[in-house]
Amino acid sequence: MISFNQDIATALDRAIVKITDKFLEPPIMITISNSDSVIGTLGNFSASTGKAKSRKTFNVISLVAAALSGKQILQYKVKVPINRPLVLYCDTEQSRFHCHRLISRVYKLINYPTTEVHENLKFISLREYPTKERISIIEYALSKYAGKI
């Protein structure tokens, strides 16, 4: 987030990407098995968007399960750095009841006991909050768990 004291012109100059720039490819985190498709790299923020009832949640839950288990779940393989094992899941649409059901599905996919809280999953249900509060809560969570997610 750019602070109001920062020179915006300098920030703009630094933000421009040129064809002559050279960058190292970030470590690959999420792939689809049996293909060369990379769908996530270390340091990137991902959101799942699409039409209603298009199986977005099903795919995301599969990714979460793969990240927590270190195993392929459905077609997804996720490599999580040992020092950054935390999965932060922010749901803005579903009730706490339905979010709880999603956590149960993740636990079932990874054969994790539902009598224990998985230390590497922080599942946040935000539907009850206004948009500005959701943003603030997500920003706080990102800063609180920085270096672990």
Predicted regions and their residues:
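N-terminal pre-Walker A segment at the start of P-loop NTPase domains
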Residues: 2-35
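A generic local structural motif
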Residues: 26-27, 32-36, 74-77, 136-140
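Short charge-dense sequence patches
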Residues: 6-18, 47-56, 86-93, 121-134
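Walker A/P-loop NTP-binding active-site region of P-loop NTPases
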Residues: 38-112
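Short, charged, low-hydrophobicity "junction" segments
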Residues: 32-42, 128
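Conserved inter-motif catalytic segment of the P-loop NTP-binding fold
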Residues: 81-149
